[in-house]
């Protein structure tokens, strides 16, 4: 099976609260992978202990596991994985799509997004707060922007589709509606049916496939 890959490069918006440490100092390396964010921000690693390795991340070298219901995988390099990006207004992630892969309807609550197609064809769209759909087939060299917080999706329509994506935020967040709000949850099928216009049999099937309970 030919693997289709998209590489997402995510650049973060330099809000003052997020970049305070980097504004005062040359940089702020979070104190280790998985460092916890606090109301006052991340704790910076002692600069005397910072090395070049803190500004290098190799976690995107390996393709993500696309053996799942959406035939896709996202491998992030946000501050939780890449401590060196804190306060710099830049981060990245990798997206791998297998044949038939799709990134379902989702939103980045804290980030706008830019997608650049390198090869292949991608169908991309977002929905405005006025419920207007902006949809476009993207070809190599095309760039599409997705406003912050709006629902959007990407679907592979060609055989291969590497691309670049930028997200304007330090830790852009990702909420995939089907995964986080409906089907994997403990909400009973009847409740979800009343809010999605899907029949209960379909909902039970989706919940089962996404690890939810009926």
UniProtKB/Swiss-Prot annotation:
Pfam families in the record: Cupin_1 (PF00190)
Source domain of life: Eukaryota
GO cellular component terms, A-Z: apoplast
Name recorded for this polypeptide: Germin-like protein
Self-association state and partner proteins as the record states: Oligomer (believed to be a pentamer but probably hexamer).
Induction of synthesis: Expressed with a circadian rhythm, with peak expression 10 hours from the beginning of the night.
Binding site for Mn(2+): 106, 108, 113
GO molecular function: manganese ion binding
Record-annotated disulphide pairs: 28-44
Keyword Secreted: yes
Database matches in InterPro entries: Cupin_1, Germin, Germin_Mn-BS, RmlC-like_jellyroll, RmlC_Cupin_sf
Matching PROSITE patterns: GERMIN
Subcellular localization: Secreted, Extracellular space, Apoplast
Alphabetical UniProt keywords: Apoplast, Disulfide bond, Manganese, Metal-binding, Secreted, Signal
SMART domains membership: Cupin_1 (SM00835)
Tissue specificity comment: Cotyledons and leaves.
UniProt domain Cupin type-1: residue ranges: 58-204
Main location: secreted
Record keyword Secreted present: yes
UniProt signal peptide: 1-22
Similarity comment: Belongs to the germin family.
């Amino acid at each position: 099976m030919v693997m289709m890959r998209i590489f997402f490069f995510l650049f973060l918006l330099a809000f003052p609260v997020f970049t305070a440490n980097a504004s005062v100092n040359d940089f702020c390396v979070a104190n280790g992978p998985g460092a916890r964010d606090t109301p006052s921000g991340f704790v910076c690693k002692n600069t005397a202990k910072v090395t070049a390795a803190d500004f290098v991340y190799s976690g995107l070298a390996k393709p993500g596991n696309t053996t799942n219901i959406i035939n896709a995988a996202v491998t992030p390099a946000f501050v939780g994985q890449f401590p060196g990006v804190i306060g710099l207004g830049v981060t990245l992630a990798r997206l791998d799509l297998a044949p038939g892969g799709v990134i379902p309807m989702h939103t980045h609550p804290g980030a706008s997004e830019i997608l650049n197609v390198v090869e292949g064809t991608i169908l991309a769209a977002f929905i405005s707060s006025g419920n207007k759909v902006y949809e476009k087939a993207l070809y190599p060299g095309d760039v599409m922007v997705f406003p912050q917080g709006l629902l959007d999706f990407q679907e592979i329509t060609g055989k291969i589709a590497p691309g670049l994506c930028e997200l304007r935020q330090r830790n852009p967040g990702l909420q995939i509606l089907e995964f986080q709000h409906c089907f994997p949850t403990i909400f009973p099928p009847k409740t979800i049916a009343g809010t999605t216009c899907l029949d209960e049999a379909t909902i039970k099937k989706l919940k089962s496939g996404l690890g939810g309970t009926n």
